[in-house]
Amino acid sequence: MNNERYYLLTGAAGFLGTNICMQLLEKGCKVRALVLPNDKSVKYIPENVEVVLGDLTDAPSLEPFFTVPEGCTSVVIHCASMVTVNPNYSEKLMAVNVGGTRNIITKVLNHPECEKMVYVSSTGAIPEQPHGTKIKEVSKFDPCDPKLVVGAYSQSKAKATQMVLDAVSVMGLKACVVHPSGILGPNDHAIGETTGTLLQIIKGEMPMGMQGSFNLCDVRDLAAGTIAAVDKGRVGECYILANKTVTLKDMCDMLHAECNAKKIKFYLPLDLADKIAAGLEKQAEKTGKMPLMTTFSVYNLARNNEFDYSKAETELGYTTRSYEETIHDEVQWMIAEGLIDGNGVTEKPALMTNEQIREGGYMEDIVKAMEHVPALPEIDPEKAYKAIEQNVVETYEKIEDGVVGSYKKVENGFVSAYKKIEDKFVQKFLARKGETTEDVKKRLGRK
């Protein structure tokens, strides 16, 4: 009797999905992938993965994906979602991320041979905590505070996560949730945002960076953690799959050490970057072009990106490798793919070259965006010198006053002590003669 287990994977053509496929195949597992019709990314799915066409938003189209041979069981890893850096509400986003998850839940409940569901959420779905506090798993996601769960994507993932947990408690769904942070590493065939940024840095096409921090995980570690959740994840529980934070400067230094990438010399303060981004967004509304930088991207650097992933380490056996190892492997993958030649020269464009910025008129957008940034005050050298001089004089006077004051206090103390000693001495002398100070004053005719 055939008793194979099928791993049903949505989002199999994505960065995380392809790595999950590869690891499952290495374990000898039977893998089936759900792919949108006419999705060009299907070419990135490894061989030996069964591909089934379907649409998350079309429930009937999912039936072939869930139907497995008689006697077989299945588990679902729901990895697919629509990702966007646009923070504004989108019906399509909600239809895919929330409505699509609802359809997956319904199918799992209608197929008794489906033993488990692992929902791939996001750390962005967890309410942000103040800086200095590590963010931990929560059990309630909806309603979400838009000030703590920022952006339409994160809010859609929060709603979908709550839907999964509600189905567990109300309908008996056997499911758990993983919350990956940002993704980094090799095998990013579609050249996503993070890989594109690294290519820009390697090519020297990023003239300046931004301050702030990321939380990025090696895609292979995220894939392993997600697969582990199938058998080790407790039903109704959530697990953060994250890493230590890293700055853009740290990343640039690692790339410089790995492949002699050009170092970025200037990093925009986040408050200034936010103002420039706001200006670029206003300009983009007029031109219809995507802004080079958004206030949402600045927020993601400025927010608290410290996550506590100890629960996943303890229960799932989740581990993270060093950023240095990930950077090394990703650079080697880029060389193997012909993206770079080993000397930091790329054959494919990263996100956008300087020439493309100029030709597309983006430079004009940046200049116009700067009009929305409050002007910095002009500096008069003579006034600046006088201000410094005045500050020095005032500081000296304070020190001088302090010294003089201390001297006077000491002097007064000596005088007071001397008078006390003198008075005691006189009293003792007169006592020997049987007189008092009053007797002496009368004898001398003094008052």
Would you name each region that the model predicts?
Residues 5-27:
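N-terminal Rossmann NAD(P)H-binding glycine-rich loop of SDR-like oxidoreductase domains
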Residues 143-148, 197-217, 221:
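A conserved pocket-lining segment of Rossmann-fold NAD(P)-dependent short-chain dehydrogenase/reductase
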Residues 193, 210-230, 237:
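Substrate-positioning beta->alpha
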Residues 225-293, 309, 314, 324-360:
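Mid/C-terminal beta-alpha module of Rossmann-like enzyme folds, strongest
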Residues 148-176:
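Active-site Tyr-X1-5-Lys
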Residues 91, 99-151:
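Conserved Rossmann-fold NAD(P)-dependent oxidoreductase catalytic core, especially the SDR/UDP-sugar
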Residues 39-40, 49-99, 103, 107:
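NAD(P)H-binding glycine-rich loop region in Rossmannoid oxidoreductase-like domains
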Residues 126-127, 173-195:
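Flexible, glycine-rich beta-alpha linker
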